[in-house]
């Protein structure tokens, strides 16, 4: 069976077979059941053999598992050496790419070209990690004259192409490559740089297996023709040149024809750029004449992780290296929880360009850090004595603002965590840009040293400015960092800023969707903690029940805090409770619904709690056990428009109608982003999306106006690119409102086909508001109590050109 039925006597197929023999009567053979392939596990010939070996045993193991190492319940079968059943003469090719570079799409084109224009059989499998654009992808392609029935990934390749240079130290790219095979690396390194940047083990394999080794600077070619980071056609041309599956001239002609079919709807400009990339690819391909000494060298790039905590070393690193399938069951957490802040260990290094800060023109507005989707650029405020021993490249300027008088300021990039989207540079308001995107190799060394110094020597100055001001919010540590979201993502900036405002006391129920995938994909979590160990608690149930899930969490916290208040009341009535403890207990009871006061009084209670022990009060232990509830929790439900407008609307409506104090943030991309861009009720009239390829024929559901009809729900419509201060006001008011709050955030998305690129997502949001496409407003029931109109329209009368805005997005322009 390829399923697990918890609580059953056996899996479905096993039970069906047992039942069939039992009902037939007569002779019944020994029936053995087991499980394979769970969690996308590969099912290889060696595993099949292990099943037969088990059946040949004197006492075959029943209810076995194959493909995992179960050292907890000991159900697994021992697997022997791997072997291949691929027909002789089959060519196996492996392509390692990065999400959104076009590698997977190009390989699908290649399979189609070869399958349609040769007598070869073709097969393709594609493996991805759970990150969005910028994540790891592996394409497994096989071609041969015999039918290919190998339903498993390639274990021994003739051709390996690595489309991202950073991968050479992150993955074992050449594992299983055949003697005399071909290896193609996308990089701009000459032989000297290859000596320095390739690990010794990779050089050993190249030389010992006599590989044909080629390099190509595909990024340079793609940028020269205007494709940016889309290197797929360059690398595909190199593949057809080297693999010799089809005569090269014929392959080029077929590739160009495929380009016209694939990109024709996006206009002649895109088609011509891709054709130019094909034409320039071969001249950029260079064979490397490597020395024979590589076979035994011990010198090369080394990445050390000596100081990693156990969970990182034993679970995270193997999974990140694509070796998670080798982990035993005992390595996993029994309850499904995982530590926070683990994305900081990834250091993916996938950016092509990094922002370079110009201190001479910087006005210290911090808008660049405010909009960063990955919290990979931050302000640093330092006391002069904290700068002793700083690297020469660690340039600072006098900090502006009376609160920062006498201090120094700089903008610091996290070079290995940045995705290079350019959002920070594009929103810079300086007349002469204070951030300019520069090639990775010109920035990496200095910025790594600068970051290491800042983290080791300079404290976070979170108490100096009002956290609800734009600049003040950016002096708070972001408690969402380095997520797996797309470069330029429109969703994560909202959540990141939210964690800077309330993160140390947030509890989040997340609907399944983009925000749950970039929010907590095993094995790493981008939600982190501050220096005191406080940060968001995060959980995900299902797609459809996030509102109910969050409502249940909120109700549980409410009930438990009521119990704590009861204990505090009883403690106050206890003889002998006086002085600082009594003041602290009474102060907390009077201010338990005030976030800052409840935290402060709670700390005072804990500091004096031993007084209860001294007077033999039995309440001390009970209060201590509930200490995490002293600070008022900020309960949030996160989800996309697919959840809020469609799948989970019934639950959302129930929660909003309840009148309870809970906050909802809807990240509105106007499509089901996580599953590839299907139309939702948030998709506007005329927008092209999956299931609406001729343009959606109905209008957008007005979720905000529907919620306002209750009269007691706080509702806000926000757009970070258009008005950052309005975003802060809405977040502050919604969290402070003693009742249900709904915030609908416009989130530009890669599925919208923004023609300027995702680095201009903030500009796109601004254009949407200026054109009247998206409105900014706040509906605050508290104003009605004062006799005022609760509705405030924050966006101005449209001044932009709606047609110009629509023409800038493929979802409309293609229509």
Please report, for each region that a protein language model flagged, where it lies by residue:
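Thiamine diphosphate
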Residues: 1-63, 80-83, 87-179, 182-232, 491-507, ...
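General beta-strand structural signal in soluble alpha/beta enzymes
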Residues: 31-33, 64-66, 122-126, 162-163, ...
């Amino acid at each position: 069976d390829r399923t697990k039925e918890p609580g059953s006597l056996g899996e479905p197929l096993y039970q069906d077979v047992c039942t069939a023999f039992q009902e037939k009567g007569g002779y019944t053979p020994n029936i053995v059941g087991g499980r394979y392939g769970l969690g996308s596990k590969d099912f290889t010939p060696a595993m099949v053999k292990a099943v037969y070996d088990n059946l040949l045993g004197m006492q075959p193991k029943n209810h076995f598992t194959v493909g995992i190492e179960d050292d907890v319940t000991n159900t697994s079968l021992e697997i022997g050496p791997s072997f291949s059943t691929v027909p002789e003469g089959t060519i196996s090719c492996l392509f390692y790419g990065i999400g959104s570079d076009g590698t997977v799409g190009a390989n699908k084109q290649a399979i189609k070209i070869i399958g349609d224009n040769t007598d070869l059989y073709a097969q393709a499998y594609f493996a991805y990690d759970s990150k969005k654009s910028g994540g790891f992808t592996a394409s497994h392609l096989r071609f041969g004259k015999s039918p290919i029935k190998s339903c498993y990934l390639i274990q021994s390749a003739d051709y390996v192409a690595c489309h991202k240079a950073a991968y050479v130290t992150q993955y074992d790219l050449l594992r299983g490559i055949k003697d005399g095979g071909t290896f193609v690396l996308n990089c701009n390194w000459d032989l000297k740089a290859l000596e320095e940047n390739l690990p010794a083990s990779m050089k050993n394999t190249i030389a010992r297996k006599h590989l044909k080794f080629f390099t190509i600077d595909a990024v340079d070619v793609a940028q020269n023709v205007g494709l940016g980071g889309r290197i797929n056609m360059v690398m595909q041309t190199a593949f057809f040149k080297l693999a010799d599956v089809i005569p090269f001239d014929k392959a080029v002609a077929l590739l160009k024809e495929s380009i016209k079919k694939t990109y024709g709807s996006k206009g002649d400009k895109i088609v011509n750029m891709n054709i130019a990339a094909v034409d320039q690819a071969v001249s950029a391909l260079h064979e490397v004449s490597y020395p024979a000494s590589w076979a035994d060298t011990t010198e090369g790039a080394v990445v050390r992780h000596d100081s990693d905590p156990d969970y990182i070393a034993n679970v995270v690193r193997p999974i990140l290296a694509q070796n998670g399938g080798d982990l035993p069951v005992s390595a996993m957490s029994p309850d499904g929880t995982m530590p926070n802040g683990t994305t900081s260990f990834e250091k993916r290094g996938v950016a092509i360009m990094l922002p370079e800060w110009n201190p001479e023109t910087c006005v210290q507005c911090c808008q660049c850090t405010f909009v960063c989707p990955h919290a990979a650029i931050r302000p640093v405020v330092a006391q002069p004595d904290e700068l002793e021993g700083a690297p020469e490249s660690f340039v600072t300027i006098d900090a502006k603002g009376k609160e920062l008088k006498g201090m120094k300021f700089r903008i610091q990039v996290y070079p290995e965590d940045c995705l290079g989207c350019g959002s920070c540079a594009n929103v810079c308001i300086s007349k002469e840009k204070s951030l300019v995107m520069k090639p990775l190799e010109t920035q990496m060394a200095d910025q790594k040293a600068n970051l290491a110094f800042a983290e080791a020597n300079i404290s976070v100055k979170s108490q100096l400015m009002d956290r609800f001001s734009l600049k003040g919010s950016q002096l708070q540590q972001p408690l969402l960092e380095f997520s797996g979201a797309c470069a330029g993502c429109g969703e994560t900036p909202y959540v990141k800023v939210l964690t800077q405002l309330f993160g140390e006391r947030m509890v989040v129920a997340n609907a399944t969707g983009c925000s749950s995938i970039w929010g907590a994909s095993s094995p790493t979590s981008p939600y982190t903690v501050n220096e005191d160990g406080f940060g968001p608690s995060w959980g995900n149930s299902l797609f459809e029940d996030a509102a109910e899930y969050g409502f249940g969490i909120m109700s549980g916290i409410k009930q438990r805090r009521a119990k704590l208040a009861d204990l505090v009341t009883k403690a106050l009535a206890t003889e002998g409770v006086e002085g600082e403890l009594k003041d602290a207990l009474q102060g907390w009871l009077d201010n338990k619904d005030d976030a800052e006061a409840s935290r402060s009084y709670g700390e005072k209670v804990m500091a004096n709690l031993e007084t209860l022990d001294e007077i033999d009060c039995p309440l001390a232990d009970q209060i201590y056990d509930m200490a995490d509830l002293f600070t008022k929790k900020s309960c949030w439900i996160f989800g996309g428009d697919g959840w809020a407008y469609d799948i989970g609307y019934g639950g959302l409506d129930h929660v909003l109608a309840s009148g309870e104090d809970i906050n909802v943030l809807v990240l509105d991309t106007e499509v089901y982003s996580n599953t590839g861009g299907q139309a939702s009720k948030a998709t506007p009239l005329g927008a092209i999306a999956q299931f609406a390829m001729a343009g959606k024929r109905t209008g957008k559901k007005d979720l905000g106006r529907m919620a306002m009809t209750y009269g007691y729900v706080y509702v806000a419509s926000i757009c970070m690119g258009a008005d950052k201060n309005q975003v802060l006001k809405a977040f502050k008011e919604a969290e402070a409102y003693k009742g249900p709050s709904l915030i609908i955030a416009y989130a530009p998305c890669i599925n919208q086909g923004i023609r300027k690129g995702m680095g201009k997502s903030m500009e796109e949001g601004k254009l949407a508001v200026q054109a009247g496409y998206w409105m900014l407003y706040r509906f605050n029931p508290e104003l009605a109590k004062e006799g005022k109109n609760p509705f405030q329209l924050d966006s101005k009368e449209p001044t932009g050109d709606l047609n110009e805005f629509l023409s800038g997005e493929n979802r409309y322009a293609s229509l």
